Structures are given as structure tokens and as C-alpha cells.
């Protein structure tokens, strides 16, 4: 199953030219109810770089991370207006640094306790 997902991601992103960025993201300390230093995102899942799925995606995209302890968001979409009609996040709401790789991977995230 994981292999199929990796192949799907690889074939979907064939036209995406990604340089090899080195990202230095340390543990964020924002309060769990605010997002003043990043963007508010609705992500399908999140985890650490030690997670095999996330490590595989980082490898496919040639994203090199150094000293990352914050969460990594997977398949995230920005939430632009909090409380607007129709805005909802049924997955995980995360506040992430502006290290977004086409919405597939977003680095430097912390969970946010917010009702949308």
C-alpha cells in the first residue's frame, strides 16, 4: 500500500522541478491556539521525519531536512479566513512555517486547537 502511494506521488509530481533545499526547522513554541508566525493549514495527516511514509516522501522530493523536531504536515491546504461560511477542516489543523512544497509536504508545523 505504501509503495503504491509513493509511486502515485512520484508520477503525479514528474513535472515539478524541485531543487534540493536544506531546511532547518526547530521546535516551534507558539501557543496552541494561535498562528502568528506561519500559515494556518488543514492537513490530511502529520508526523515526524522519523515516520517511514514521511521520510519516503521527503526522499522522493529530494528535500533534505536538518535538525527538524517540529511536525511535518501531509497534503495541506491553507485556511484563509477563520470562521467564514463554508470553511471547515475535518482533518488536522496545523500552524506551519512557510516551508510548503506544493501542498504535499509542509514543514515546521504545530497543532492548533481551533474549531472551524
From Swiss-Prot:
Cysteine pairings via disulfide bonds: 35-95, 42-89, 43-76, 96-109
Subcellular location: Secreted; Secreted, Cell wall
This protein's UniProt keywords: Cell wall, Disulfide bond, Glycoprotein, Secreted, Signal
Residue positions with a glycan: 44, 100
GO terms under cellular component: extracellular region; fungal-type cell wall
Alphabetical list of Pfam families matching this protein: Hydrophobin
Expression induction: Expression is increased by carbon source limitation.
Signal peptide from the UniProt entry: 1-19
Single GO MF annotation: structural constituent of cell wall
Chief localization: secreted
Recorded family membership: Belongs to the fungal hydrophobin family.
Subunit field text: Self-assembles to form functional amyloid fibrils called rodlets. Self-assembly into fibrillar rodlets occurs spontaneously at hydrophobic:hydrophilic interfaces and the rodlets further associate laterally to form amphipathic monolayers.
Function: Aerial growth, conidiation, and dispersal of filamentous fungi in the environment rely upon a capability of their secreting small amphipathic proteins called hydrophobins (HPBs) with low sequence identity. Class I can self-assemble into an outermost layer of rodlet bundles on aerial cell surfaces, conferring cellular hydrophobicity that supports fungal growth, development and dispersal; whereas Class II form highly ordered films at water-air interfaces through intermolecular interactions but contribute nothing to the rodlet structure.
Protein name as annotated: Class I hydrophobin 1
Organism of provenance: Pleurotus ostreatus
UniProt lineage: Eukaryota, Fungi, Dikarya, Basidiomycota, Agaricomycotina
Amino acid at each position: 500500500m505504501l509503495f503504491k502511494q509513493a509511486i502515485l506521488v512520484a508520477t503525479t509530481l514528474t513535472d515539478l522541478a524541485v531543487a534540493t533545499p536544506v531546511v532547518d526547522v526547530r521546535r516551534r513554541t507558539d501557543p496552541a491556539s494561535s498562528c502568528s508566525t506561519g500559515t494556518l493549514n488543514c492537513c490530511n495527516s502529520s508526523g515526524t521525519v522519523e515516520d517511514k511514509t514521511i521520510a519516503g516522501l521527503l526522499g522522493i522530493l529530494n528535500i533534505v531536512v536538518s535538525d527538524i523536531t517540529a511536525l511535518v504536515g501531509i497534503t495541506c491546504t491553507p485556511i484563509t479566513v477563520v470562521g467564514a461560511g463554508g470553511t471547515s477542516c475535518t482533518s488536522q489543523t496545523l500552524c506551519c512555517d512557510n516551508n510548503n512544497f506544493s501542498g504535499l509536504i509542509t514543514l515546521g508545523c504545530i497543532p492548533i486547537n481551533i474549531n472551524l
